[in-house]
Amino acid sequence: MRTPIGLISSAASERVLADRRREQVPTPFGSVEILIGKIGGHDAAVLLRYGEKMTLPSHKINYRANIWALRELGVTRIISQNAIGSVNPAIRPGDIVISDDFLDKTRTRPNSLFDDSEAWVRVDMTNPFCPQTRAALIRAATARSNRVIERGVFVCTEGPRFETPAEIRALQMEGGDIVGTPLVPEVVFAREAEMCFASIAPVINFGAGMAPAVIHTGPGSMNDMYYTDGLHTLIEDIIIDTAKLLVDEARTCGCGRALRGGFHGTRPEWLKHCSLDEGA
Ligand SMILES: [Zn+2]
């Protein structure tokens, strides 16, 4: 069996994930429900990060268990679907951003998979997102849309509230382009787990103070932007195409060797099959 692709999203329609079944995956950090099925005809594991009934806000998600559950299922590449707001006036609702960097503005989340171990790791973040997975997302997205922005700084805030206008102005000055709440620490833990990770982020609103207040439902709302106007379907099509592109590509990025050199302390017993097993 080929290595399954992993998708982390808030929802996954039958279009994007076919032949689905649920699987409860035990991890050292707790048990996680994963949907197993096919994306574009290929094996896939999908994690609904807010829970199936959207009961978990970003600051309450068990990020360590989620990433480790995907790893236990053999996933090496994760696509993260992030509907987000824009901080940059040049990036408008309807655009699709494939981020190449991030700013971490979270406050209460675990810092590392190894926080409860007698070990720590200093992973390199020169390329915070997997370059190979990003390239596949960009190829798939530009084939279907002329509104793809191939670089961007994703600001991850704590939430669950939206930002204030002053916060948005501060994030603009710090170089942020888009803003959302669940990216960090997913991207960090994927790197610590030696998995590839990249984000596809449809823009569905402007940050506070850049436009009239956000409307959640009804005409002109964020939900209309995403679901009624076809953006959500487009994103799912791009994810399907990306899975097809990646399935036959050998990993040429360095994500699978992230622990080499930066690992200190005693290797926890749950850390199996990683680059620390390779010779010097
Ligand atoms: Zn990679």
Which sequence ranges carry the predicted segments?
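His/Asp/Glu-rich mid-to-C-terminal helical/loop segments that flank catalytic regions of hydrolases
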Residues: A208-L259
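Short acidic/polar active-site loop segments enriched in Thr and Asp
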Residues: T76-R77, D177, C196
